[in-house]
From Swiss-Prot:
This is Exoribonuclease 2. One of its GO terms (biological process) is mRNA catabolic process. It comes from the Bacteria. Residues 577-659 form the S1 motif domain. The keyword Zinc-finger does not apply. Residues 189-532 form the RNB domain.
């Protein structure tokens, strides 16, 4: 009687339409139920309804009121959490193939089929790439996936690398090379092989793309008036045609990927590590910048760019050069007087330039780099905190001044290029930055002066931003630096000259690593076009966008692999509840995120372990500080002692408690 009754259908539709509808994102839990988070509130999703959705799905749901509680009934899929994803192979009790999504908040197994292109015989725990084919809300069928790619076996010790690269859709292989390479540049090169160029790199570096030669500038009375520096940079574009496959692959990769233990080069290894590498006593094609400074490190006159042949006379290592300059006992010594002279002069020049940048630009605060020392099987033997020593600073200062010269040379002669830019504070956060500085630095005496000094208008200028950074530099601790960092915008690649607030410079364009960075290859081609009086083609928006995207991807790959390796390294140490000094990186409602100073690992400290009553914990998002009963206990930049209590390799997370 009631079947196909139009009145009943109409009544049902009216009842449905009368219910409020919301859009939101599904939040899974480790129980069968979940939640729908909307902009304004959070709704309960009952276990039967959770079977139709997955953590992270963006959905439309009807809101039903049951008793005095509201709950969401999922109705429509707006955007699935999963499309392409990383998973582990699983076989259920009936030996049916399933996949377990590699995500900390998704724990339901998904039925799967193997694509015909995947030839491997899959075993429990193998790593794969899968795509979601059906979704209950969209297709009226259960979740179902197709395995599209085999990554590695469950036993592969290098899974952290291969899985992470697959997740971010990056190749684990170098770019394919050519059978032969020939010199494509027809211009005459100046012979600079007599100059005593030296390279300073890590001991094991093969892709050496910069060599340095320096001499003092003297007046007729033999008094020194400045420095003359030649920066020779490897010239891969001399061998790579613009329409070649190597160029296309480099444009896609954008950077050499430096991973714990090894790198994946942007160019074929026979170019990056051999033909273009500025190897000791080998004549190499190079693009050279010759520049002069006065005794204070100020650039004098116009820098000169030339195509040249150079020959590195010494392959030097950072630690050896630093030991020698710091007069460490039994330190390495230069092989001959010419090399010794170059090291000493480069040292003097670097100190002058550091001083110049301190006054006229901005210096980065010293923070260590953490490097993983691996055994052949990929196991982490140790993690070293490496500080930049004087030899690193020599190379850094030489590269920075060369990149400043490149920016202004391209702006003047090519009217375009790939420029590294940074505009400081995000416009929308300028008032926040002003208020924060006033709250932390002003008092009754200086309030009027600082209100002007740190006005929104002044903070938006390069000079005003640099002045503010110089003001806070002597202040003890990292709190101001860390908090202000959250108000900054991201660095960007642009095709016109623009300031780089982070460096405190009016212009910056890198060209000193063409073996490792595609942007530097582009700038090489533009410098060469200027030298040959050819047309300079503006880099496309697509190239700039790809550089931005690739830089972000590479950082995520490096971070994800490191998180995994930290878990492996600390897994067998957690039983002894080791204690570490750590720096607070973030304060959240759920707890603190801290970084271990000894090895750089990121550890989460749950709020429940800090204070038993969560209602008495408040987080001040303006200060990025955690309060207990109205009293500020922790803020970003604080140094705390923590005890490591848990290592979860499956989610790549470390848990600790405050001591």
């Amino acid at each position: 009687m009631f079947q196909n009754n139009p009145l009943l259908s109409q009544l049902k539709q009216q009842l449905h339409d009368s219910k409020p509808h919301v859009e939101g994102v599904v939040k899974g839990t480790d129980k069968a139920y979940g939640f729908l988070e909307t902009e304004k509130e959070t709704f309960f999703i009952a276990p039967p309804a959770m079977k139709k959705v997955m953590h992270g799905d963006k959905i439309k749901a009807a809101i039903e009121t049951i008793g005095d509680k509201k709950q969401a009934e999922p109705e429509e899929l707006i955007e699935p959490m999963l499309t392409r994803f990383i998973a582990k192979v699983r076989f259920n009790k009936d030996k049916k193939l399933q996949v377990l999504v590699d995500h900390p908040n998704i724990n339901q197994p998904i039925g799967a089929a193997q694509a015909k292109t995947v030839k491997q015989e899959l075993k429990e725990g193998d790593w794969v790439v899968a795509t979601l084919k059906t979704h209950p809300l969209r297709d009226d069928r259960f979740f179902y996936a197709q395995i599209a790619e085999f990554i590695c076996s469950a036993e592969d010790e290098f899974a952290p690398w291969w899985v992470t690269l697959a997740r971010h859709e990056q190749s684990r292989y170098p770019v394919q090379g050519q059978e032969v390479y020939s010199m494509l540049d027809t211009e005459t090169r100046r012979d600079l092989t007599a100059l005593h160029f030296v390279t300073i790199d890590s001991e094991n570096t093969q892709d050496m793309d910069d060599a340095l030669y320096i001499e003092p500038v003297t007046a007729p009375n033999d008094e020194q008036t400045g420095w003359k520096l030649a920066v020779a940079i490897a010239d891969p574009t001399a061998y790579i045609a613009l329409d070649s496959q190597i160029e296309k692959d480099a444009r896609k990769r954008c950077f050499t990927n430096y991973l714990p233990g090894f790198n994946i080069p942007m160019l074929p290894r026979e170019l990056s590590d051999e033909l273009c590498s500025l190897m000791e006593n080998e004549t190499r094609a190079a693009l050279v910048c010759r520049l002069e400074t006065d005794m204070q490190g100020e650039i004098v006159g116009e820098p000169e760019f030339i195509l040249a042949q150079v020959q590195s006379k010494a392959k030097l290592a950072y630690n050896n050069v630093s030991d020698y300059l710091e007069q460490v006992e039994n330190a390495w010594q230069p092989e001959n007087e010419s090399t010794q002279q170059q090291i000493n002069w480069l040292h003097q020049f670097a100190l002058v330039r550091i001083n110049w940048r301190k006054k006229h630009g901005l210096l980065f605060k010293e923070k260590p780099d953490y490097s993983f020392v691996l055994a052949d099987n990929g196991h982490v033997r140790e993690i070293k905190a490496e500080y930049r020593r004087i030899a690193n600073q020599i190379v850094e200062e030489s590269m920075i001044i060369a990149n400043i010269c490149c920016a202004h040379y391209l702006a003047k002669n090519a009217q375009t290029g790939i420029f590294n830019t940074h505009v400081g504070f995000d416009k929308k956060f300028l008032p926040n930055a002003h208020n924060f500085l006033m709250a932390n630095l002003s008092n009754e005496e200086n309030q009027q002066e600082l209100a002007e000094r740190y006005s929104v208008e002044n903070l938006a200028t390069l000079a005003g931003y640099c002045r503010m950074r110089h003001d806070i530099e002597p202040i003890e601790g990292d709190y101001l630096e860390f908090r202000l960092r959250r108000f900054l915008t991201f660095a960007e690649f642009k095709s016109e000259l623009a300031p780089h607030f982070g460096l405190g410079l009016t212009g910056y364009a890198t060209w000193t690593s063409p073996i490792r960075k595609y942007s530097d290859m582009v700038n090489h081609r533009l410098i060469k076009a200027c030298l040959a009086n050819r047309e300079c083609v503006k880099p496309s928006d697509e190239t700039l966008a790809r550089l931005q995207e690739a830089r972000k991807q590479n950082r995520m790959v490096e971070r994800d692999i490191a998180d995994w390796l930290y878990c492996r390294y600390l897994a067998d140490k957690v039983e002894s509840n080791p204690e570490f000094r750590a720096e607070v990186q973030d304060c959240m409602r759920g707890g603190l995120r801290v970084q271990l100073l000894e090895n750089g690992a990121s550890v989460f400290v749950p709020a429940s372990s800090i204070h038993p009553n969560k209602d008495e914990i408040q987080v001040n998002t303006d200060e990025l500080a955690l309060y207990i009963n109205g009293e500020r206990r922790y803020k970003i930049g604080d140094i705390v002692n923590i005890r490591l209590t848990e290592v979860k390799e499956e989610t790549r997370s470390l848990i600790g408690n405050l001591v």
